[in-house]
Amino acid sequence: MTVVLDTLVAVRRTAMDLLARREHGRVELTRKLRQRGAEPEMIETALDRLTEEGLLSEARYLESFVSYRPRSGYGPARIREELSQRGLQRADIDLALRECGISWQSQLEDTWRRKFSGHLPIDAKERAKQGRFLSYRGFSMDMISRLLSGRDLDD
């Protein structure tokens, strides 16, 4: 059953349904509404109105995203990249990452312990494997090097 988004009311209702599930950024919401067949002019009008009413907020979306992604083991570089791909401004992303109150070193250690059971690499191959995984997850090489050398562990 396909919903036809040919009226402003239908576009608004669909946008509100999406926002009821979780926060969305404007670019992401626009993309989803276009995929459902809504006209660009109606999308802009509906989203402008939702923004005026406080139902669509980039700041809330940033805060929500930055609070839940680290719990999945992702670091600041990966989160920054994902938010950039979703059309958010780099300055806003950097501000949200600074103000989130997350200890990225602790997050790195938690992610490493979950994946590698807290075992430091015994050879270059294992060190490279652990480093690649943590780098892909969005942690800086400086932080990873300190961790894998055993300098930051508080066991």
From Swiss-Prot:
Keywords: Cytoplasm
Biological process per Gene Ontology, one example term: regulation of DNA repair
Localization (cell): Cytoplasm
Gene Ontology CC: cytoplasm
Keyword Cytoplasm: yes
UniProt signal peptide: none
Pfam families in UniProt: RecX_HTH1, RecX_HTH2, RecX_HTH3
Record carries keyword Cytoplasm: yes
Domain of life: Bacteria
Gene3D superfamilies per the UniProt record, alphabetical: Winged helix-like DNA-binding domain superfamily/Winged helix DNA-binding domain (1.10.10.10)
Membrane-crossing residue ranges in chain numbering: none
Function: Modulates RecA activity.
Family: Belongs to the RecX family.
NCBIfam families: PRK00117.2-1
Name this protein carries in UniProt: Regulatory protein RecX
Species the sequence originates in: Pseudomonas tolaasii
Lineage of producing organism: Bacteria, Pseudomonadati, Pseudomonadota, Gammaproteobacteria, Pseudomonadales
